[in-house]
Amino acid sequence: MGNRRLAREHALQTLYYADTGKTQGKDINEYKEDFKDSLDAAGFEFCSGIIDGALEHQAELDKIISAYAKNWSLNRMSVVDRSILRMAAYEMLFSPENTPVAAVIDEAIELAKKFSTENSSRFINGLLDQIKKERKNGQN
């Protein structure tokens, strides 16, 4: 498994715990330390950037996701799907990494297939594709 994919998996797990409030008294930085040994320095920095960025921009990301989630409120989405969407939207719109948008969407789909449902992967793909098109048209 690639270092960035593993970094995204760790970021997803951390954002999931943060969203559910099941942090067991740990703060986010303690969660990051838990998986530091499984990533190289670049992977750890990438993962930390996604976590910190998605949390910092969460209100704005939620507005964007809600605008494209036809007939779906954020509260109705599974926590896993919501976390994947926040991560991917953060990477597409705010991350200084400049990861190609197609790669971000592909990684989000793979995370959904692994941690959620097949229907979720299609939903996530469609929503992120809409964000990509709007971004390309300069509307985001």
Swiss-Prot record:
CDD domains: Terminator_NusB
Domain of life: Bacteria
Any GO MF annotation of the entry: RNA binding
UniProt keyword list: RNA-binding, Transcription, Transcription antitermination, Transcription regulation
Pfam families in the cross-refs: NusB
Keyword Magnesium: no
GO cellular component: cytosol
Gene3D superfamilies: NusB-like
GO BP, sorted A to Z: DNA-templated transcription termination; transcription antitermination
Function: Involved in transcription antitermination. Required for transcription of ribosomal RNA (rRNA) genes. Binds specifically to the boxA antiterminator sequence of the ribosomal RNA (rrn) operons.
Similarity field: Belongs to the NusB family.
PANTHER family in the cross-refs: ANTITERMINATION NUSB DOMAIN-CONTAINING PROTEIN, N UTILIZATION SUBSTANCE PROTEIN B-RELATED
NCBIfam families: nusB
Protein name in UniProt: Transcription antitermination protein NusB
Organism this protein belongs to: Elusimicrobium minutum (strain Pei191)
Name of encoding gene: nusB
